[in-house]
């Protein structure tokens, strides 16, 4: 066990505890905590030169739990009252399967400067921040979440986004300069604006913005898939 694998295990523990609690609010906070551990385990692995195949596999398995199963379970528990639980379960299965498929693809593809398909942590963070937002009456998203059609569509949309071949820019390349740095800077500026003006909706809005910027700044010169 090294420091990177310890952080990955804490990511896994966060997702598992979120599932055990079954509370959309507290569980979503644990998913966000897991995302923080997930962010740092890669940096620590590269810094300590401990980024071997075992750590990579462990990281993906942890991500399936924290960014696939946990958001799916919590989203299911937060379904609209008038919605048949069977339909909620079906779309959650698609979300979890889409996350697992995305991470399996991630593991077998060569390294790239961009992601092919929405990264699973972005999907997990969307649902975590969405579920936190709807706990507050003044949130924009309460009415949207209460709409069964929108509720059912969101997991299907994100399952598809994670597995399309379109590129999404990676935080690993934040050091780029000139026009290549524009999507990163735009995302930072707009996310800061969301936090200041609409803090309850900042998380989902930031993920939507990330998706939109990836489409606008489509890196057509990237032809390989990400690791």
Model-based region annotation:
Residues 1-8, 47-105:
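Multi-pass membrane catalytic core of lipid/isoprenoid biosynthesis enzymes
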Residues 11, 15-18, 70-73, 95-102, ...:
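Helical transmembrane-bundle signal
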Residues 1-39, 180, 191, 203-206, ...:
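Topogenic membrane-insertion module of multi-pass membrane proteins
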Residues 42-52, 98-117, 163-171, 215-223:
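C-terminal ends of transmembrane helices
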Residues 116-227:
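C-terminal membrane-associated helical module and adjoining short loops/tails
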Residues 13, 36-44, 61, 65:
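Active-site His/Glu-centered metal-binding helix of metallohydrolases
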């Amino acid at each position: 066990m090294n420091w990177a694998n310890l952080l990955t295990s804490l990511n896994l523990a966060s997702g598992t505890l979120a599932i055990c609690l079954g509370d959309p609010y507290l569980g979503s906070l644990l998913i966000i905590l897991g995302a923080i551990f997930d962010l740092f385990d890669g940096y620590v692995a590269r810094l300590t030169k401990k980024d071997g195949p075992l750590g990579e596999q462990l990281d993906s398995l942890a991500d399936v739990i924290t960014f696939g199963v946990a958001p799916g379970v919590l989203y299911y528990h937060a379904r609209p009252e008038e919605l048949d639980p069977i339909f909620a379960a079906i779309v959650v299965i698609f979300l979890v399967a889409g996350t697992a498929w995305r991470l399996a693809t991630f593991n077998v593809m060569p390294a790239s400067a961009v992601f092919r398909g929405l990264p699973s942590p972005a999907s997990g963070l969307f649902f975590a921040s969405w579920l936190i937002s709807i706990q507050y009456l003044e949130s924009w998203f309460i009415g949207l979440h209460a709409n069964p059609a929108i509720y059912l569509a969101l997991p299907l949309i994100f399952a598809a986004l994670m597995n399309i071949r379109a590129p999404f820019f990676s935080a690993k390349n934040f050091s780029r300069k000139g026009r290549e740095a524009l999507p990163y800077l735009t995302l930072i500026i707009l996310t800061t604006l969301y936090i200041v003006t609409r803090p309850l909706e900042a998380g989902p809005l930031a993920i939507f913005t990330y998706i939109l910027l990836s489409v606008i700044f489509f890196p057509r010169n990237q032809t390989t898939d990400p690791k």
